[in-house]
């Protein structure tokens, strides 16, 4: 009952904040034997491109249309990539998706399929294939289970097993504290240095990138979190897991409007019960100087390195107040009314 009330409390809090703030087998239409795929391949170049290639033929007419689609995560949305080919009974088609730095999460499984149509009206849709968008600068190791996968390099097998244990512990912690559980396995990608991870992150501006060290980043649309093996790695992991779980809870039309203070504040609240850390000290100092943020101004993250500690401390303080002081009851009523 307590966990259910807590879960509804989180739902209510979210709603309140939003209101106030190989050659694949084939599926065919028409003549099932008219179109045949003789080759289908995919390659990736990290932070540069994804390249797909197809060879196909039709016994019924000229192949007039070839489309390439890819998807990831829960697979509910497919993305189309323009193809290049010359129509004919036998075609070779290519499709290239440029990948900007940080656009895709590293070590991501990308599923893709082709849809081919000939002049006789036959359409073939291939079964999905998978290509890994790999950060090919490193030799990756991998371990996991049905709830999470951990990928790392430069450390022993025991490191990966420990990280997987932390991941499961963090997921259990979220379920016990808030009654919420991820609907898909978490993918944890661990880098060994800031320089190593920088190429996997989207640039945020020269000042921020130079002055701040990003210990972790949740890529909720990919079901992936990136983190550094530095400092208190378990705390970083739990923080980023909170982002994945919260975005999984509210995914849909409201997700893009989730205020940053709630997203980050809940992650800070979940990562540690320690209320006497550097973030709290930064916030206390800002309160004494009357230099805190308005909650409305915290709907987007703060990009000033000297203000980061205050911002995170204040986000946690707001969430702690809403959850601890008001508990699940008031928020539960909001959740029941709107879910």
What is the predicted role of each segment?
Residues 2-12:
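Bacterial N-terminal signal peptides that target proteins for export
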Residues 11-21:
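Bacterial N-terminal signal peptides
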Residues 22-141, 146-149:
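Glycan-association/targeting regions that enable binding to alpha-glucans and other polysaccharides
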Residues 139-259, 289-292, 300-307, 311:
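Juxtacatalytic substrate-recognition/specificity segment
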Residues 249, 256-299:
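Post-HExxH zinc-binding segment in Zn-dependent metallohydrolases
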Residues 292-336:
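Pan-zinc metallopeptidase signature
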């Amino acid at each position: 009952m307590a966990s259910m009330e807590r879960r509804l409390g989180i739902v209510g809090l979210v709603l309140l904040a939003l209101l106030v703030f190989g050659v694949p087998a084939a599926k065919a239409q028409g003549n099932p034997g008219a179109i045949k795929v003789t080759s289908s391949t995919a390659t990736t170049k990290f932070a540069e491109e994804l390249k797909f290639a197809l060879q196909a033929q039709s016994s019924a007419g000229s192949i007039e249309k070839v489309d390439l689609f890819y998807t990831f995560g829960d697979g509910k949305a497919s993305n189309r990539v323009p193809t290049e080919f010359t129509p004919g009974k036998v075609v070779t088609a290519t499709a290239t998706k440029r990948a900007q730095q940080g656009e895709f999460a590293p070590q991501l499984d990308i599923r893709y399929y082709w849809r081919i149509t000939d002049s006789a009206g036959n359409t073939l849709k291939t079964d999905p294939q998978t290509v890994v968008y790999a950060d090919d600068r490193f030799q990756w190791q991998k371990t996991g289970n049905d709830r999470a996968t951990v990928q790392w390099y430069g450390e022993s097998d025991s490191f990966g097993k420990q990280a997987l244990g932390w991941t499961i512990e963090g997921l259990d912690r979220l379920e016990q504290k808030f009654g919420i559980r991820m609907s898909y396995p978490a993918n944890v990608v661990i880098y060994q240095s800031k320089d190593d991870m920088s190429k996997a992150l989207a640039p945020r501006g020269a000042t921020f990138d130079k002055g701040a060290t990003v210990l972790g980043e949740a890529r909720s649309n990919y079901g992936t979190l990136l983190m550094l093996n530095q400092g208190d790695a378990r705390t970083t992991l739990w923080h980023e897991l909170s982002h994945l779980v919260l975005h999984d809870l509210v995914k849909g039309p409201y997700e893009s409007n989730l205020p940053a203070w709630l997203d980050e504040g809940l992650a800070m609240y979940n990562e540690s019960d320690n209320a006497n850390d550097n973030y709290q000290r930064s916030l206390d100092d800002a309160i004494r100087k009357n230099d805190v943020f308005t909650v409305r101004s915290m709907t987007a993250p703060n990009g000033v390195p000297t203000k980061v500690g205050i911002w995170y401390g204040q986000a946690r303080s707001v969430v702690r107040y809403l959850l601890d002081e008001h508990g699940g009851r008031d928020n539960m009523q909001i959740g029941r009314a709107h879910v």
